[in-house]
A protein has these predicted regions:
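Acidic, His- and aromatic-enriched active-site or binding-groove loops in soluble protein domains
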Residues: 47-52, 147-163
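Short, solvent-exposed loop/turn and secondary-structure capping segments
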Residues: 33-34, 98-99, 181-183
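Active-site-adjacent substrate/metal-binding segments within catalytic domains
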Residues: 1-54, 64-86, 201-237
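Short, charged/polar micro-motifs that form catalytic or ligand-binding hotspots
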Residues: 24, 106, 161
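Active-site neighborhood of glycoside hydrolase catalytic domains
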Residues: 40, 46, 56-142
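Solvent-exposed loop/turn segments at secondary-structure junctions
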Residues: 27-29, 51-53, 91-95, 135-137, ...
């Protein structure tokens, strides 16, 4: 995104009360402009290293050298940023092993417990370090301890009360809900969905819209006035 676009989006986030953004290990490192704007706007950053889901062959000398260079470069560029509050070893690495029925401690090898935290310490950063997101507790995906990925209100369509009743201590990943789109036969072609799931994230949004507001999302798409009232914007002519 351009600096102007970044400023627009991050200002919207700040004005909405967002106080932390996570750069996930499934993505890519952000631009200098992103971190500078987070510094300026007072938005904290949870920064994953770009590792996710896999068992990385860190014992291989060639791989280790590349990872050491990457970690040193990333921490060297971000250690001075007041917005960077957390460095994390990656996304769902410990969870992946646990979901396969393996001991999640097998994922706590030299990559996440030695090399990456060592790079953070060597950079002089005082940011917290977390081995993986999620992590903590007997199983990394349990909510009662450590860092959680919570989708109870979301993909699992739990009632809204579950947000409080599930006992989530800290959610570094959860499902946000979008507004209802216009009625367009092609609108849902790009709607994301988990592989193998029989629902899309639009279905999740519609479920909670109906539950919380008592309205029919499909009907809203055909009623411009009702849709405008829900969005709190003037209806189009």
């Amino acid at each position: 995104a351009t600096p102007a676009r970044l400023r627009h989006l991050l200002t919207l986030a700040r004005d909405a009360g967002v106080n932390m953004l996570r750069v996930s290990g499934t993505a890519t490192y952000e631009s200098d402009a992103f971190y500078a704007l987070c510094d300026e706007l007072g938005i904290l950053v949870w920064q994953d290293f770009m590792f996710a889901n896999f068992d990385y062959p860190i014992a291989d000398d060639g791989v280790r050298v590349l990872v050491e260079k990457e970690a040193a470069q990333v921490t060297g560029e971000l250690a001075h940023r007041p917005s960077v509050a957390v460095f994390c070893g990656g996304s769902e690495i410990e969870q992946q092993l646990a979901m396969l029925g393996l001991d999640p401690e097998l994922a706590q090898g030299p990559l996440s417990t030695e090399l990456l935290p060592g790079a953070v310490a060597a950079s002089g950063s005082d940011a917290a370090y977390v081995t993986s997101s999620p992590s903590g507790g007997a199983l990394p995906f349990r909510f009662g301890s450590g860092v959680a990925h919570y989708f109870g209100v979301g993909g699992y369509r739990r009632p809204l009360s579950d947000v409080r009743l599930a006992g989530v201590r800290f959610a570094s990943e959860c499902l946000a809900l979008a507004n209802v789109p216009d009625d367009d036969a092609d609108w849902d072609r790009g709607v994301p969905a988990d592989a193998g799931a029989d629902w899309t994230f639009a279905d999740v949004r519609d479920h909670y819209l109906a539950e919380h507001y008592g309205v029919d999302p499909a009907g809203l798409r055909r009623d411009d006035l009702a849709l405008a009232r829900l969005r709190r914007v003037p209806a189009r002519d």
